[in-house]
Amino acid sequence: MTKEEGRTYFESLCEEEQSLQESQTHLLNILDILSVLADPRSSDDLLTESLKKLPDLHRELINSSIRLRYDKYQTREAQLLEDTKTGRDVAAGVQNPKSISEYYSTFEHLNRDTLRYINLLKRLSVDLAKQVEVSDPSVTVYEMDKWVPSEKLQGILEQYCAPDTDIRGVDAQIKNYLDQIKMARAKFGLENKYSLKERLSTLTKELNHWRKEWDDIEMLMFGDDAHSMKKMIQKIDSLKSEINAPSESYPVDKEGDIVLE
């Protein structure tokens, strides 16, 4: 019998409570870090230190959540084992095949929603907000160290702090805000694909044409071809040298003719 199998239902409950308190502690630590990051009075050094601590705290929270789920499972197993020993049939409903199927389906959906929630948190990170800020046409200068969320996004997020806030309404605003960004990106994508693609193709053809013309002019002027101006000038210089050579070897008269002796 292993240590987990030998635990009583009471001991399992104690383990579960301890894991729950540990998860709560990690969660409160993360909330403290997020409060510091959201405080505009926080200094740059404090913000940098808080950002460095955040990944480790998040990892500890994930690990404690895993342990908490495992302890819940062990507690349930200990409860069923104790009920079996005492002769109670409180698990009769669980042993119903239909109930087991519903339980499995519910657990599967819960696990899928959890993964989707974690993925959503990653997608709604600072990188996405930076992309939103960059997409604003009124922003001409973008500084990484002085980045702040857009005013519209900041206004929506601040509504979460109000005590009488309708969370679903704020969630709908964020969803609508992100949908508008997606629609704008889709619009620009369609314009780039259909409206600007033909223009770009035409400009590319013209550019290639003039590039070829420029290369031909360069070859005509400075190329090594026999008909290039460079070769023609070299031939002219060579002919001049050949013409001037006899005048240096033989005497000439006043009119420039060679004097024959």
From Swiss-Prot:
Alphabetical GO biological process terms: cellular response to azide; DNA recombination; mRNA export from nucleus; stress granule assembly; transcription elongation by RNA polymerase II
Listed InterPro entries: THO_cplx_su_Thp2 (IPR018557)
GO MF annotation list: nucleic acid binding
Chief location bin: nucleus
Superkingdom in the source lineage: Eukaryota
This protein's GO CC annotations: nucleoplasmic THO complex; THO complex; THO complex part of transcription export complex; transcription export complex
Keyword Transcription regulation set for record: yes
Keywords annotated in UniProt: Nucleus, Transcription, Transcription regulation
Entry keyword annotation includes Transferase: no
Location within or outside the cell: Nucleus
One Pfam family hit: THP2
Function per UniProt: Component the THO subcomplex of the TREX complex, which operates in coupling transcription elongation to mRNA export. The THO complex is recruited to transcribed genes and moves along the gene with the elongating polymerase during transcription. THO is important for stabilizing nascent RNA in the RNA polymerase II elongation complex by preventing formation of DNA:RNA hybrids behind the elongating polymerase.
Assembly with partners or alone: Component of the THO complex, which is composed of HPR1, MFT1, THO2 and THP2. Together with SUB2, TEX1 and YRA1, THO forms the transcription/export (TREX) complex. THO associates with DNA and RNA in vitro.
Further comment found in the protein's record: Present with 2840 molecules/cell in log phase SD medium.
Protein name: THO complex subunit THP2
Species the sequence originates in: Saccharomyces cerevisiae (strain ATCC 204508 / S288c) (Baker's yeast)
